[in-house]
């Protein structure tokens, strides 16, 4: 189990083909790495763990697994990797088939896998991508980009958030910057949006619990649209449904009057109802 003295934040690079990763970031002065075979009874897993290289130099930790001819085979080795490191460290990881879980505050976090789930607790910035699997992102103080095919859950993002989901529901708690969310098949639910919003889905409902200001564009092929307008915000509306009811529960006015904020809402659905209400 390699242990390195690390007085401050470090950068981490992980490259391997099959397995799982657990990263724990805390206030500490060392970094501990453990590489284990996923199954100690499987020769391929044991060999993959033995051939995995771990190196630390110049504040950079590198973990590199052995190259395997093909990933999608029961004969290929799988490793379980655990890294305990200082809070605020950067993590960049790339694996064709792996699950990732992080706990504690990280710096910039970039994780990419073709097949596997990704769960990130906290980060300064995040870029997460899986071609097949769920993604859960907790809190990001800066910008975040999430691309997946499965269920996507995002907590709070302080900056810009971009989400692309090819098949699955998308749940976003709150975004304080610009939000762009696109889904081929699945619902998009947004709790609080304090900036511009652009959300599109070919099949699914779109719900925004509360918008405060800016421009909001919502589009669904088949699905309902619901938007809550914050108290003290005046709204300009341009909403249409080809086959469905449109209901505006706001009080009408000739202009914004003494409203503290203004929002422009454009919404369209081919099949579904639209509701605009106070949040």
PLM regions and their residue ranges:
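Intrinsically disordered, low-complexity terminal regions
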Residues: 1-279
């Amino acid at each position: 189990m390699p242990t390195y003295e690390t007085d401050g934040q470090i950068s981490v690079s992980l490259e391997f083909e099959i397995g799982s990763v657990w990263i724990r970031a805390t206030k500490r002065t060392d970094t501990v790495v453990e590489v284990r075979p996923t199954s100690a009874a499987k020769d391929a897993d044991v060999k993959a763990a033995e051939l995995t290289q771990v190196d630390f130099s110049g504040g950079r930790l590198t973990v590199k697994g052995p190259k395997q001819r093909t990933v999608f085979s029961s004969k290929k080795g799988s490793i379980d990797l655990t890294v305990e490191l200082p809070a605020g460290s950067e993590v960049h990881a790339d694996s064709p088939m792996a699950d990732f879980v992080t706990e504690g505050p990280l710096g910039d976090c970039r994780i990419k896998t073709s097949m596997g789930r990704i769960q990130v607790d906290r980060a300064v910035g995040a870029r997460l991508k899986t071609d097949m699997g769920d993604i859960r992102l907790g809190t990001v103080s800066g910008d975040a980009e999430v691309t997946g095919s499965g269920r996507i859950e995002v907590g709070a993002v302080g900056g810009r958030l971009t989400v692309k989901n090819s098949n699955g529901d998308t749940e976003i708690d709150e975004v304080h910057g610009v939000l762009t969310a696109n889904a081929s098949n699945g619902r998009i639910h947004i709790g609080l949006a304090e900036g511009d919003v652009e959300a599109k889905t070919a099949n699914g409902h779109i719900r925004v619990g509360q918008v405060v200001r800016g421009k909001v564009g919502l589009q669904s092929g088949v699905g309902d649209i619901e938007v809550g307008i914050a108290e003290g915000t005046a709204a300009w509306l341009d909403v249409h449904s080809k086959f469905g009811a449109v209901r505006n529960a706001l009080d009408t006015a000739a202009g914004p009057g003494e409203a503290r904020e203004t929002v422009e809402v454009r919404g369209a659905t081919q099949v579904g109802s639209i509701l605009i209400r106070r949040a």
